[in-house]
Every structure is written in C-alpha cells, then in structure tokens.
Amino acid sequence: MAKAKFERTKPHCNIGTIGHVDHGKTSLTAAITKVLAKTGGATYSAYDQIDKAPEERARGITISTAHVEYETADRHYAHVDCPGHADYVKNMITGAAQMDGAILVVSAADGPMPQTREHILLARQVGVPALVVFLNKVDQVDDPELLELVEMEVRELLSSYQFPGDDIPIVKGSALVTLEDGDPSIGEDRVLELMTQVDAYIPQPERPVDRPFLMPIEDVFSISGRGTVVTGRVERGVVNVGDEVEIVGLKDTVKTTVTGVEMFRKLLDRGEAGDNIGALVRGTKREDVERGQVLAKPGSITPHKKFKAEAYILTKEEGGRHTPFFTNYRPQFYFRTTDVTGVVTLPEGTEMVMPGDNVAMDVELIAPIAMDEGLRFAIREGGRTVGAGVVSSITA
C-alpha cells in the first residue's frame, strides 16, 4: 500500500513517549496511530512494528529508536519511542531525536517508578520544554481514590523537578483497551483527549530561521583584495549583507560587519539556517579568527568556561573507555567544530563514573566557548568519542 503523502501545511512538532519500563509507552504510541488513522491523520503502526525499533548510530553511539508520524487537526507530529531505558538516556542526552515536548506515561496500577523519576529529571536537564501525562492502565484500577492518589503523586514529582506540576494536563485512560477496541470512555476517547491536550499545551517550537543568527566557523580564508572569509553552516537565523555580527569564543569577542555572503561560489544577499555559506567579514585579519568560534547576532550568545552538564559515557562495546574515571578527569569537549580541554568535577557522593553510566557533572574549560543551555557536545580522548553531553546550566 502506497504511503499517503503528508501535506506540510500544518506546523510541525517533535514529541516522544517517556516513562518507566512496561508502563505502556509503546502501546500508547500504537494507540495514537490507531485512533488518528480513522481520520486519515496516520498510518496505524502495531505494537510489534514499533517495538522492534532499528538500531541507529548517532555520534558514534548505538541507539534504538522507533519513529512514527501522525497529524491532528492542528499539527503534524514526528514521534519517537525507544525500546529500552538506556536508549532513552542516550537519545535525550545526544539530542539524536529532538523533543519539543513529551508524553510521560505512568501506569495507574504502579504509580511513579524509578525510571519515571529519571526521565523527568533528564527532560529537565536537557531542556524538554513541556510534558503532558497519560495515566495508563486505568482499567486495572477499580478504586477512584487510588487514581487520585497516583495523580497527586505524579504532580508532586513533576513539581519537585521544576515542572509546573499543578498545571500539567493529566489524561487517564488505557492504551490496551484502545488497541483492543474496548470501552471508548477509557480507550479511544481518552487518546483523542490526550492529543487535544498535546496540541494545546506543548508550545509550537520556534523555527530555526526565526531565531537569532548563529554560524559555527569551520574554516577561514584570506582572499587577496577582498579580505577574510569565514565558512560554515548557518545553525539558526538569517544573515544579510551589511549586518553587524560578533565573533564569539576562544578569544575576546569582536564586532565586525558581513560585507558579502556567497554559496556555491555565487553571491547572495543573505544566508539562512541550513545554508553552507562563506561570509566576508570587514576589517578582520585571517589570524584573528579560528575554527571553533561562532559568527553571531550581537549580544545573542556569550562565551563561557564553566557549566553543569548531563552526560552519557560510552560502553567499551560502543568504542568508549574500558575503565571508570574520577573527579579531575581531563578529556576534550567537542563543541560544534572544535575540541577544548576541560576538567570534570563529579557531584558529591559520586566516587567514579563507569562506562555506560549517565552522570550530572561540573566542567571547567581552559578556553571559553560560545554556549547557551541545551548545547550538545561530545567528550573525546585523542579524537575518539568516549561520551556525549548537554549543557544543563551555565555557571560562569
């Protein structure tokens, strides 16, 4: 059967299901596609189709992720679901599957469990903007007071990780009942209600082109008679000929003006997110600019050395370290286009970090890098990736 072509007229949003093992993340994913297939907004993906997610390699890390897509009346969604807990950890930290929001699935029969807590913490650390809760398996709970208790517990847990626990929509239903065409009042109707809440509560992400201009510098050339050209792929925003920009990172921030933009050797009047461009910068010497710096809209990003991060450390099988590391570990941190050495401080009570662990840590770099919260990086030793991380907060 030919796949229906999705019309890209609706705003697009990336979401995923998170939560404890066996609480019903994959069943809910299947249930959403089943219900939306009735209105032509999806192709039904059965549980076992989603469950045998293919392995992908992102930044040298093996991650199993299932991708489904569907649309509601208001939006087009790309939805990720991971088979194993480790896959979630890797996915959220590497940003392999970007999440603009997530559906937290909690079994009403069990209440919040350790991975529920860990996924909420990860969502907070990696900057997932909003969560909606699906309280699943309500068909297994006879006592309405028990349901209320579980709901209160989930709200308190969300609040303890700085999510607005009192305001987050919680929809109660059963993914399994939906898949088995059972009672719609806890099945299909609840899945539709969930999607209405997701549409309304998860904010529409800003398109990269609407954000302040930023281009990581990959290379620098000197063109006789014209000046210095920096090249790279525009990460966000737009740059027009004549715009004032800053060169940020590694050294003191310098202001300059873009006097020319070219792409594939053709002159343009602007470059935008996704374009590989060369930008001619006025009055800048070739030796003043280097790979690893960024070209950015003035005042939109600042250079920093110290930050808190959430990181995943590769296993030996993934090509990572064979041994643990301790506080004062000094690897290289690869941001955008370059490596910078940094010193790691582990949190109190964490003696060491084993390959395969994920950890919150403090890092101090030897040179400042243009960064904002949510920036992803690789941890490397001599060019070999041994970990992946995300900046959760900037400390200096």
Curated annotation (Swiss-Prot):
Residue ranges of the region described as G2: 60-64
Binding site for Mg(2+): 26
Domain tr-type G, first and last residues per copy: 10-206
Keywords: Cytoplasm, Elongation factor, GTP-binding, Hydrolase, Magnesium, Metal-binding, Nucleotide-binding, Protein biosynthesis
Primary site of residence: cytoplasm
A GO molecular-function descriptor: guanosine tetraphosphate binding
Entry EC no(s): 3.6.5.3
Protein name: Elongation factor Tu
Organism: Gluconobacter oxydans (strain 621H) (Gluconobacter suboxydans)
